[in-house]
Amino acid sequence: MDNRIIYVVSDSVGETAELVVKASLSQFNGSADDTHIRRIPYVEDIGTINEVVSLAKADGGIICFTLVVPEMRKYLVEQAEKANVLYYDIIGPLIDKMESAYGLTAKYEPGRVRQLDEDYFKKVEAIEFAVKYDDGRDPRGILKADIILLGVSRTSKTPLSQYLAHKRLKVANVPIVPEVDPPEELFSVDPKKCIGLKISPDKLNHIRKERLKSLGLNDKAIYANINRIKEELEYFEKIVDRIGCQVVDVSNKAVEETANIIHHLKTKGR
């Protein structure tokens, strides 16, 4: 049969409905090529439904739809039946079954799948951001970040950046070293975006010694020398005082605990 047409009606983009229709058509030899799919997205009023039903009646088309709002679903079904137009509700019956089986109430919000997709891509973007602007490798990230972490070596800057990225926050981190001037960008951003990571000298001394041992190196190296550590921490204090940013003590905290504190500070500061 020539000029076959299927109307895909949705209160969102309509991708889900169109994929189902195409999958169904693929079961018939040549049907996908011979059938025109017309997508009608963002249907929010009965006027559009009336128009689609009239078109489908005129050209013998089928209406396949994903309308989550019960009133809109009901109206389309009523109008299609009055006009003797074939229709298929792709998502409604399954939502009804789930409500009945699980004792839950659906949100009935159009576009939930797209919202989930957007949330996922925001997380991926934040993770990629954390990798790109890790360890101060590109100071330009400081100006783009939601949060800037600064601290001496082995204060969990990188794992914290990754953990916070999973909360959709773009985090740059900057190492503080006495011999290296901090990037000027640190002093031009809103101090509320900056978080200093403080740690006790003894705790840092222990962490660095263990790090050297794990690398098969001598734990007497200057990197783990207590006097050197104190020098680094004093310099760190000068920098955070100059910036005027908040400081979080990470001495006896797990990464998750510190990340939650930082996330709370960020949320509170909005």
UniProtKB/Swiss-Prot annotation:
Coiled coil: none annotated. GO terms for molecular function: ADP binding; ATP binding; phosphotransferase activity, phosphate group as acceptor; protein serine/threonine kinase activity. It holds the Pfam family Kinase-PPPase. ADP binds at residues 151-158. Belongs to the pyruvate, phosphate/water dikinase regulatory protein family. PDRP subfamily. NCBIfam families: PRK05339.1. Bifunctional serine/threonine kinase and phosphorylase involved in the regulation of the pyruvate, phosphate dikinase (PPDK) by catalyzing its phosphorylation/dephosphorylation. This is Putative pyruvate, phosphate dikinase regulatory protein. It comes from Bacillus velezensis (strain DSM 23117 / BGSC 10A6 / LMG 26770 / FZB42). The lineage of its organism: Bacteria, Bacillati, Bacillota, Bacilli, Bacillales.
